[in-house]
């Protein structure tokens, strides 16, 4: 690989069409499309300030780099990328990509980040602020995620999450084939309108979780007292709850078991009669 060290690039497309290069200590200043239509590139200990600095790149490794707020929409249409030990302060990163892997990365404005990514692996990643991370992405594996960004994981398919701490309402909406292990899911309206959802040893908080769903499985999950009106219009439920749940409302079918159930509500709008879903209060 050709080495480029300790240089500054500005203007339009200064490294357009570069292949087989290793960059160390470079700076991309004001301008656009600093690295574009490239392949087989490494970049280490560098800083990015210009807009759209990394588009249409196939095969890249980025480590110990900083992306400033001005570097918005920085990495799009780039496949087969590994990023480690980086800090990102710009919005709208990582769009329409295949095979993207991040480890020890902090994203401090996660607005519209990870859109339409197929094949995403995250390890020890932090997301802050912004809306709709992960929209329309699929084939996702996460181990270690802290996020207070709004509306994460919407319209996603084939997702596996471990050791996450997620704080937002409307997470995991319109999703299919999702499994979450050993995580904290904080926020109202968890996983509405989703199907084939499995939660294992998770703690759930927020109003009206898990509604309008088909095929939802819970294993040894716990609920905060604020979790009322759970499982409304849910079918094919298989829920084993540790501790108590405050309220269950209008479930359609399946089985719900908890150590304690505050109340069960069936209204005139219920889509199934009482008893169609088996509900077991182990305290009685």
Residue spans for each PLM region:
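Long, distal/terminal scaffolding or interaction modules
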Residues: 1-284
